[in-house]
C-alpha cells in the first residue's frame, strides 16, 4: 500500500499534542486590532484545542501527526 499524503496546508495550521489532540490558532487576531482590548488580544494569541467534532477530519489530513 502506498504512503498517505499529508495536506501541507493543514500541517501548517494544526499541531498534535502528546495525547493525540490538535491545537489551532484563534481567529480575529490578524488585523483591525486597534479597537480590541489588550485582554482580548492576549486571549486571542493563545492556542485552542480543535473541537472533537473536527478532530477526525484533521486526523485524516495529517495522518502521521
Swiss-Prot record:
SUPFAM superfamilies per the UniProt record, alphabetical: L35p-like (SSF143034)
Keywords in alphabetical order: Ribonucleoprotein, Ribosomal protein
GO molecular function: structural constituent of ribosome
Ribonucleoprotein listed as a keyword: yes
Ribosomal protein found in the keyword field: yes
GO terms (BP aspect): translation
Gene Ontology CC entries for this record: cytosolic large ribosomal subunit
Alphabetized Pfam families for the sequence: Ribosomal_L35p
Family listed: Belongs to the bacterial ribosomal protein bL35 family.
HAMAP family linked to this entry: Ribosomal_bL35 (MF_00514)
PANTHER family in UniProt: 54S RIBOSOMAL PROTEIN BL35M, LARGE RIBOSOMAL SUBUNIT PROTEIN BL35M
Protein name as catalogued: Large ribosomal subunit protein bL35
Lineage of the species this protein comes from: Bacteria, Bacillati, Cyanobacteriota, Cyanophyceae, Synechococcales
Primary gene name: rpmI
Amino acid at each position: 500500500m502506498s504512503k498517505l499524503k499529508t495536506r501541507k496546508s493543514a500541517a501548517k495550521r494544526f499541531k498534535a499534542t502528546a495525547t493525540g489532540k490538535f491545537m489551532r490558532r484563534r481567529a480575529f487576531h490578524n488585523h483591525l486590532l486597534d479597537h480590541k482590548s489588550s485582554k482580548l488580544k492576549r486571549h486571542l494569541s493563545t492556542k485552542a484545542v480543535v473541537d472533537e467534532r473536527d478532530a477526525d477530519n484533521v486526523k485524516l489530513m495529517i495522518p502521521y501527526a
